[in-house]
Amino acid sequence: MLIHPQFDPVAIHLGPLAVHWYGLMYLLGFALFLTMGKYRLKNGNDVLTVPQLDDMLMYGAVGVVVGGRLGEVLFYQPGYYFSHPLEIFMVWKGGMSFHGGFLGVLIAVAIYGRKVGRGFWQLTDFVAPLVPLGLAAGRVGNFINGELWGRVASPELPWAMLFPQARMEDIAEAQQSADLMNMLMQYGGLLRHPSQLYEFALEGIVLFGALWIYSAKPRATGKVSALFLIGYGLARFVSEYFRNPDAGIFGKSDVISMGQWLSLPMIVIGVALLVFFGRRKQG
């Protein structure tokens, strides 16, 4: 059994300013995006210039923050945020939806593409392999915050983890069965999957490796983007089985979660695009 370290969510105090780990993970994600993007541009990819990459990152950063926050508000906790509207702007507390941020980035890329005269799929093919490392950094931020913990795990699982932050939810969930109540009494809480780390591995490291290797050779326009949709959708769909389900706009369900509902269209659209772009190249 492991116990979550309960990190201080504030990394650095600069006078009255508190710099949170969650925000630093976003900055790390942006830095990795720039580093890997510039590497690609200096090694044969001429879709953008380096200054244009810097500019596009600014567009994308606005898209991911605005879209991610609106996605959290609309997809997961509309009732809470509509009752506490000022908290919509408290992004340092966490609460960012990937799917909302993804839509925000797509809009930002489309706007920037029109500005510089580049095709939408050209840009998304370039961006897709650069995104997963940022996702990995975000999941590290979730773990540091002790949020988005997993479903109840067997005590026999060596890395089953006790999340002290989940105490109230543990007590409520333990009322459902004698086994859970016994676990609560024995360990002082329910042992859970560290699902943030599963998502770090699947949506971050594994997806990055697959896309980076696949995109190293010239591919038909749109195919790298399609592979990202399929890869992320599958990784998120699988990891959601270990993550404590969010309520979402359809209510809380142990059968299919809100994250899975939002990932299904990504998989379907990704497969359709892969077929479409493959046939267009053959034609």
Curated annotation (Swiss-Prot):
UniProt keyword list: Cell inner membrane, Cell membrane, Membrane, Transferase, Transmembrane, Transmembrane helix
Organism: Chromobacterium violaceum (strain ATCC 12472 / DSM 30191 / JCM 1249 / CCUG 213 / NBRC 12614 / NCIMB 9131 / NCTC 9757 / MK)
Keyword Membrane annotated: yes
Principal subcellular localization: membrane
GO cellular component: plasma membrane
An example Gene Ontology biological process: lipoprotein biosynthetic process
Annotated transmembrane regions: 14-34, 56-76, 88-108, 258-278
Protein name: Phosphatidylglycerol--prolipoprotein diacylglyceryl transferase
NCBIfam families in alphabetical order: lgt
Highest classification ranks of the organism: Bacteria, Pseudomonadati, Pseudomonadota, Betaproteobacteria, Neisseriales
Top-level lineage group: Bacteria
One Gene Ontology molecular-function label: phosphatidylglycerol-prolipoprotein diacylglyceryl transferase activity
UniProt keyword GTP-binding present: no
Family, similarity comment: Belongs to the Lgt family.
Cellular compartments annotated: Cell inner membrane
Function description: Catalyzes the transfer of the diacylglyceryl group from phosphatidylglycerol to the sulfhydryl group of the N-terminal cysteine of a prolipoprotein, the first step in the formation of mature lipoproteins.
Pathway(s) this gene product operates in, as recorded in its UniProt entry: Protein modification; lipoprotein biosynthesis (diacylglyceryl transfer)
Record-listed E.C. numbers: 2.5.1.145
HAMAP family reported for this sequence: Lgt
Chain residues that bind a 1,2-diacyl-sn-glycero-3-phospho-(1'-sn-glycerol): R139
Pfam families associated with the record: LGT
